[in-house]
Regions:
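Structural motif
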Residues: 130-132
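Bacterial Sec-dependent N-terminal signal peptides
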Residues: 1-33
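Residue-level recognition of conserved beta-strand edge/terminus positions
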Residues: 136-137, 382
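Cleft-lining beta-strand/loop regions that shape enzyme active-site pockets
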Residues: 28-38, 42-59, 82, 112-115, ...
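Short linear motifs in exposed loops
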Residues: 115, 144, 177, 339, ...
Length: 548
């Protein structure tokens, strides 16, 4: 009996010990068990569907839908890239793709060339903005989406694409055989001088070797135009490769300067990036323009130069993308672009605006933390970069907006270019009074109409007033407002002539001088650039901002 009792006691103690041990063993294995369990469930569902579902299954579509739905629970930057989208991955990282070099759009159910890139196959073959692509390699495009048409235009460099084209104003279609090339989107959209000593570089994306393009532009501005101050325009620059941002920063800050730190879940994701070369322009005054679309590598560059009190940041608060992605190879030539780390500026700031693990709302300003720049200025984390000088957009939704969005301006520019072989240079081109009147007549002949946004809100207000029972007492006032808010097209074409002319001249200039010409023209009316010029010209103001 004693022996049995001891055995029972030992067994009982062993059970207790094992039970106490289980939580500690399982704690490290729980997540792997959950992964295995859910994989089993997913595979079981697929098996049951394959065996029992009444119709055949679209396996590829089902799998991609399941993966994409899963990734939507994380953040918008973690994405699955199937083999069919491999070209998009190449474009994302290098800025290169195989194609004809043209931007296309859908207009009235047709695929139209919005803009051929200068010097690219489309432009060299004689294709023009406004040309309608009727067929690509015998496939009719009527009703096709832009992505469908784009996939047919892209392909292996050196291969031919046969196009059937309809040109506005001409009755017959014609054919073009265009040889695809490796198309490289130029990261520097424009560079030039804004005054005798101030350079300007508009930088659109941080793709592979884009820092070299920046260096070449800056070198030319210094050697040929003798600039000694620089405005870097990062507006609408959504970022790209971190290394390119570091290489640009290294031109202006001391060797071994910390630019950005990455911190992730695994050790391999933790990295510190410092400059490795002596700066070429350590004393050049810098001003960086940013807006709400400046993100990622743009914020790394602007944030580092702000933290080191090396550049004045001007514009609007940036996007707030403080997450870094790596591309991981998957089976069957597919890829996963996955968020692996958060980045931190030299002062220790993480600029991520939205917490995707929580309620997916932007971090309110009162919950952000303070950090100090090199010379003691206060900056904050969470929510992007707050500029040293904030600018506001001159937001207008008048008739010019509707003329643009309804492609009236685009169509008139097509007609204008067909009847004018040449125009003046971008910095001198102007529409005459007679030419503007011709545009007015064109708009009237097109039976153009539009409804003011304020009128739409007024109708909503009228409905709410009726629901609340105040219709009788407010009806006459609302009717007066309705009459006042009816667009008078003839009057509005004159009242908002300045805004309309700017858009129209810009579109016309692009037909002759392409993107660079358009950028040069638009600088003339860019209020932010004018404000930036005033700041960078004022040495005392620059000093007061950077070293208060």
């Amino acid at each position: 009996m004693k022996i049995d009792g001891l055995r029972r006691l030992k067994t009982k103690n062993l059970v207790i010990i094992l039970l106490l041990s289980v939580p500690f063993v399982c704690f490290g294995q729980t997540k792997y068990f959950e992964i295995s369990q859910n994989s089993d469930i997913y595979n079981a569902v697929l098996r049951e569907l394959e065996l029992n579902y009444v119709d055949s299954l679209p396996h590829k579509k089902m799998t991609e839908t399941a993966i994409n739905s899963m990734l939507k629970l994380l953040d918008p930057y973690t994405v699955f890239i199937p083999k069919s989208d491999k070209n998009a991955l190449t474009m994302m990282t290098t800025g290169m793709y195989g194609g004809i070099g043209a931007i296309i759009m859908q207009k009235d159910g047709e695929i139209v060339i919005a803009e051929p890139h200068e010097g690219m196959p489309a432009q060299r073959s004689g294709l023009k903005a406004g040309d309608i692509l009727v067929q690509i390699n015998g496939v009719k495009l009527k009703g096709k989406s832009v992505s469908e048409a784009s996939s047919k235009l892209r392909g292996i460099p050196g291969t031919e694409v046969r196009l059937k084209v309809k040109r506005p104003g001409e009755k017959k279609t014609f054919e073009k055989v265009v040889v695809r090339e490796a198309i490289k989107i130029e990261p520097v959209s424009y560079y030039g001088t804004l005054s005798d000593s101030i350079g300007y570089i508009s930088f659109r994306e941080f793709t592979a070797k884009s820092a070299n393009s920046f260096k070449n532009a800056l070198s030319e501005l210094i050697q040929q135009h003798h600039i000694n101050k620089l405005i870097i325009d990062l507006r609408d620059n959504g970022g790209g490769l971190v290394n390119e941002a570091i290489e640009i920063a290294s031109l202006f800050v001391p060797k071994r300067s910390l630019i950005v730190s990455l911190k992730g879940k695994i050790k391999e994701a933790n990295k510190v990036y410092k400059t490795v070369s002596e700066p070429l322009y350590p004393e050049m005054p810098l001003l960086i323009l940013v807006n709400e679309e400046s993100a990622s590598a743009s914020e790394i560059l602007a944030g580092a130069l702000q933290d080191m009190d090396r550049a004045v940041i001007v514009g609007k608060r940036t996007f707030g993308k403080g997450l870094v992605q790596n591309v991981r190879m998957l089976p069957h030539e597919s890829y996963l672009k996955v968020t692996t780390a958060k980045y931190y500026t030299p002062s220790g700031r993480c600029l991520q605006a939205i917490n995707y693990t929580g309620d997916r709302k932007k971090t309110p300003d009162n919950l952000t933390s303070e950090f100090k720049t090199l010379h003691g200025r206060t900056v904050r984390d969470g929510g992007g970069i707050t500029p040293d000088t904030t600018l506001t957009d001159d937001e207008k939704i008048n008739i010019s907006y509707y003329l643009f969005t309804k492609n009236i301006i685009f169509d008139y520019a097509t007609q204008y270019a067909a009847s004018h072989p040449t125009i003046a240079t971008p910095d001198t081109f102007r529409l005459s009074d007679e030419e503007y009147q011709q545009f007015v007549d064109y708009v009237i002949d097109r039976d153009f109409t539009y409804q003011l946004e304020s009128n739409k809100y007024l109708q909503d207000l009228r409905k709410m007033i009726r629901i609340e029972g105040y219709e009788a007492s407010t009806d006459s006032i609302l009717n007066q407002l309705t009459d006042l808010l009816k667009p008078d097209i003839q009057k509005d074409l004159q009242l908002f002539r300045k805004d309309i002319t700017f858009m129209l001249e810009s579109e016309i200039v692009k037909r002759y001088y392409f993107q660079k010409g358009e950028a040069e023209y638009r600088l003339r009316g860019d209020k932010w650039v004018k404000d930036a010029l005033k700041i960078i010209k004022d040495r005392d103001k620059m000093t007061a901002i950077l070293r208060p």
